[in-house]
Amino acid sequence: MQYTQQELNQIINSGQKPLWLNNADLSGADLHGADLSKARLLRANLSQANLSEANLSWADLTYANLSGADLSSAKLKATTMSGANLNGAILTQAILEEADLSRTTTIKADFSGANLRGANLSEANLSESNFSHANLREANLSETTLDSANFSQADLSQANLRESDLTGANLEGANLDGTDTEFAVMPDGTIDN
């Protein structure tokens, strides 16, 4: 279902919690600063939407389309985005602590400066994404495709990178203290075992 901006504002401002917007077409919507905490947005189309500074903590965005969406400085703590499309999404300075981004398609997304502490990114395709200066401490990146991803100055301490593909990734200045890289393909193509 497609909503006009006015209808969307009325729904958000109704105070109803949680909001049920499963399968909704919110493509291109301006949701800057909106409180969508605990919202149900399964399979919703949020492509090219402005979600900067929005609160999506504890929301369910399973299989949602967030391609090209602006989520800069958004709050996504413990948000479920499993299987979502985040290709080209902007998540700079976003808070994604303990979020579930497993099995997402997240090519060329920008997570620079984002807080992903304890997040689950297992089995995701994060090729060519930017994680520079991001906090990925204790994150699960097992079996993840990280081809040509940028982790410069990122904190990957205590992260799980088992069986991930880091071919061509930039790890310059990254903190890898206690990181599990067993059976991972390292940037130079060697396998860590």
Predicted regions and their residues:
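Tandem repeat scaffolds
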Residues: Y3-N193
